[in-house]
Each structure stands twice: as structure tokens, then as C-alpha cells.
Amino acid sequence: MTAVDYTVIVVYLAGMLALGWWGMRRTTSTSDFLVAGRRLGPAMYSGTMAAIVLGGASTIGGVGLGYQYGLSGAWMVLTIGLGLLALSVFFSARIARLKVYTVSQMLDLRYGGSSGLISGIVMWAYTLMLAVTSTIAYATIFDVIFGLDRVVAIVLGGAIVICYSTLGGMWSITLTDMVQFVVKTVGVLLLLLPIAVVKAGGFAAMKSELPSSYFSPMGIGAQTVFTYVLIYSFGMLIGQDIWQRVFTARNDKVARVGGTAAGTYCLAYAVAGAVIGTAAKVLYPDLGAPDDAFATIVKDALPIGVKGLVLAAALSAVMSTSSGALIACATVANNDIWARLRGRPATASHDEVAGNRLFILVMGVTVVGISIALNNVVEALTVAYNVLVGGLLVPILGGLLWKRGTGAGALASVAVGGTTVIGLMLWKGVLANEPIYIGLLASLVAYVAVSLATKPTDAAVLDAWHRRLAGDPAPEPTPAAPANA
């Protein structure tokens, strides 16, 4: 690292804080703070959506999978992109028209208010662990950049994200995500990808140096791909962090078109990461761990200045996911859990922006503390997605697609699916495939059986649901009052 590289990194970090301050000046209401006023156009929407779904796991982990498996290492990020495409094409327009703030509020609208608390707890656990995994990644990046101690690196990276997220909420996060999207595009796609391929001697040399399995589309294994689809593609359909970005769209057309563009971008990013990892395998065949491939090729193969920009791209990947997960975690904690536990609805006199700021600050400090205590990023991320998909996929998609589904069925589905997933992870291990396979099946059986065994959802509830889905004017949902009200 040279002075030029350090300057690039420092300017980038300072810019994130400056954008946080700028975003604060645009935030005057709860809608501004939580969903950027629901007024993002297609360019900003697609850029910020791509930024949040392509985090440290997609960048550093995607290159690592390419190093380990070759081109088929792209499948993890490909399934993320395919999930985003499915969400955008089939569901985003309806989601955007609901005009809610959280997934649990959608479940309340659909089922009549019977499942919000338990679904909120499950979603909170998912967003919390997602934020933790992103925050842990700061240790790796800041170690490469500054040689910082792990704890110091986590505190530094976490403090920057907490600061700009707390200042301006979703407006600050939107502005920083757009910069991060551009930095990632330039750093990874336009610089690191071609430089890595050239350094490795081109594709012909890569093919001659590596086993044929490195160029097989299914070299990673069909079962692994199937598991990725269940966890990541379905996770894209129902995660609060993703839905909260859909809520920022100006209208349903922006949500559909912008999301489709972001999903397509993810597919290109997936292939790029796998190719970079494959090139790294040619250049550095004996690395201690596949996830070291990204840092190694950046340190050893890139020229002055470019190295700093690509490391800024890695920071961008981590920060965009971290900030998105943090605001989602705080939104769920405040609006779906705290408000229900105290049983006190908000009124117009409450300073709701201040209350949501407080929750982001508290959740951010909690995330940093857990990140310092944990080490295994992969296991934490797997727990997050297993609990999310096993507990909430069926009642959410069932609510959107099956009018016979009931609140009792949704509650049973969340409880049975979530419990089954957690129990099997304790028995078979966190990284086993059985928890998500069996958990999803158990959740589906419980949802269908209990829904058919109970009275249909009240006609008035369904009528209000269908009118909201159709985009009929409806008042903004009332979020929780602040904790200090």
C-alpha cells in the first residue's frame, strides 16, 4: 500500500460520513427516514438495490468460491440475482403498492393482525445476524489496508456505518449506496476483472493450468446449487432488508424495472467474481483459505492507486449490506416488536424520526458487540437465512398467492418451520442441508393443514388487502412511537 492508496481509502470513508450529513438534511418525516420518502426513480433504485444485495459475501466470498471451484463458484451470487429478478418481475409491484414499512405489517394486513409479533421476532433475528456478518468482514478488509487489530477494525467500520445511518436513515443510506455501487462497478468489474485475467495469462492459459472441473457449469455440485436456490433465491423474496428497498420506489413500475436491472447486474457480478477467483487460483495456487484470494490478488497484482480503489470497492460491498441490514433491523425492532410489546400506538405528536434514530444507534452498538464476540461469518449467515426462509417463506408467499391461507395457519407455519430449522441445525450442524429442506416442508404442511382446519380469513380483511394490493389510496401505516416518548 502506498500513500496514494491510503488517500483513496480515507477520502472514500470521509465521503460516506459527508453523505450521511447531507442525507440528514433531507429527512423530515418517518417516511423519509425509513423508506426515503417512497420517491426513488429507476436509476437510484436499481443502483441501491444492487448495492445492498451484493455485499462482502458476494464480493470476497464470490471470489473465494471461484478460487475453490472455478466458474461454477458463481452460483451463490447467481442465485441471489435470480431471486432478485423473481421478486422484481412477479412480486415487487404488489409489494410497493402496499405502502407499509415492514414485512410483518404486510402479514398483519393480509391475515388480520394475528402474526405480526412472532414474524417480527424472526425477521429481527435474521436482519441482526445479517448485519453482524457484514460487520465482521471489516476485520479482513481493514487488516489488509491498515494492519489493524480485529476488534479495532470492527469498531471503526461499524462506527462509520452507524454514524451515517443514524444521521439520515434511508436517505443517507441511499446516497452512500449509489456511491458504493459506482465504486464497486469500477473497482471490481472494470479494473480487477480484466487485470486478473491478463495477469493469469488469459483464458487459454487458465484452462491449461487448471483441471477441467474449474470450467464446468456444475462443478460445485447440483445439491449445492439447489441449496443456494432455497436459501438465497427464496431469501431475496422475503427479507426485510430487500423489501424495505422495494418500499423506496416511486411507483410499482420503478420497482419492477429497476429491480430487474439490478438483478441482471447481479448476474454479471457473479460471473466476474468467479472469473477473478479462477485467475487467482492460477496466480496463487497454494493459499491457506479460498477467502484469502481477494485480498491476495489485490495486494500483489494491482498497481498503485488501483489497489486503493479496489479495496474501497470491497469496503463498499460490506458497508452497503451492513447499513441496509442495520436500518432493517432497527425498523423491525421499533415497529414490529417494541410497539407491540408496550401496546402503545404512535400519535402525530411523537418525534418518530428521533425514535427511529435511537433504535438504529442501539441496534448498531449491539451488532458491533456481537461481531466482536463471533468469528465464523459463514455459520452466522447460514443461521440467518435458514431461520428466515424456514420460518417466513411459506406464510409470506402463501399470503400473496393463496387466499385460503389464514392467520392461524401463518402462525403455525412460522412456529413449526422456525423450530424445525433451529432443532435440525443443533442436531445436524449449522451447515447441513437437512435443516432448510425439512424445515421448509414442515412449514408448508403446517400452513396448509391449519389454514384448511380453521375459518377463512374475515371477508373485510381480505377486501381491505385486495384494495391495498390494487393501489387504492390508503393512509400511511402508523409506525411505532420513539422509545423516549
Model-derived features: positions:
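Membrane-embedded helix-loop-helix hairpins and adjacent transmembrane boundary segments
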Residues: 1-485
